[in-house]
Amino acid sequence: MDCSIKSAFVNAGFGAWYPKGSERLERSMIYHGCSHEMLFTREPFADMDTSKPYRIKYHALKKAIEQGYTHIIWLDCSLWFTRSPNELMDKLNHDGGFFIQSGYNLAQTCNDNDLVFGKLNRDEAELLPEMWTCIFGFNLLTDKGQKCWHYVEQAFNVGVFDTPRDHANGSADPRYLHARQDQTAVSLAYHLSGYDCAFPPNGIVADYKDNEHSLLFRQGL
């Protein structure tokens, strides 16, 4: 990669099982020859409100950016690698972002306030795929990558990361099912930034033993 690139995989988690999953993930990355920085945190950030746990991804990404990293991929504690993580960073460098569709659309996972932030109506949102945030990344050396982080920050500031996990009267529209906090925020940022590089679900990542050819498995502890 270019010498101006500073790349990192980011993970954070605290509580009962998240640190154990984080350790499992780290071991798999070392075993399979990760050649990029691994910024792993297993305790709450000092400026984080622990009563709002979905904020942790924002704080972890912000810290990486403040440290000067340009190519950043977030990884959930439920993941582990079956081969080299370097494949992901190569994809990120080539495409300017790394995202995987969840199988939902944004009409299903954005409450009314989220749609206001995204400047969308629900008919428009129904045409836009939601992204997973168990794994995603952006390249800040690109215009789209910079825009993506800008919109993630805006989403954090207006409370998209704090929406209730259940329906909680988020919309009277029957298409709305539930909000997804960080997943909603990143999905809106993806579309607002003009990205068009998302992979379909269940290819790169699969539930444990569902697809032996997947780069990552996903399973809680």
What is the predicted role of each segment?
Residues 115-126:
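Short, flexible, basic/aromatic active-site loop/helix in glycosyltransferases
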Residues 126-221:
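Catalytic core and acceptor-binding pocket of nucleotide-sugar-dependent glycosyltransferases
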Residues 1-70, 175-180, 193-194, 217-221:
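N-terminal anchoring/stem segment of glycosyltransferases
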Residues 37-40, 73-76, 98-100, 137, ...:
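A structural signal for short, well-ordered beta-strand segments and their strand-loop junctions
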Residues 5, 57, 75, 130-134:
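Residues that flank catalytic or metal-binding motifs in active/ligand-binding sites
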Residues 57-112:
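GT-A fold catalytic core of metal-dependent nucleotide-sugar glycosyltransferases
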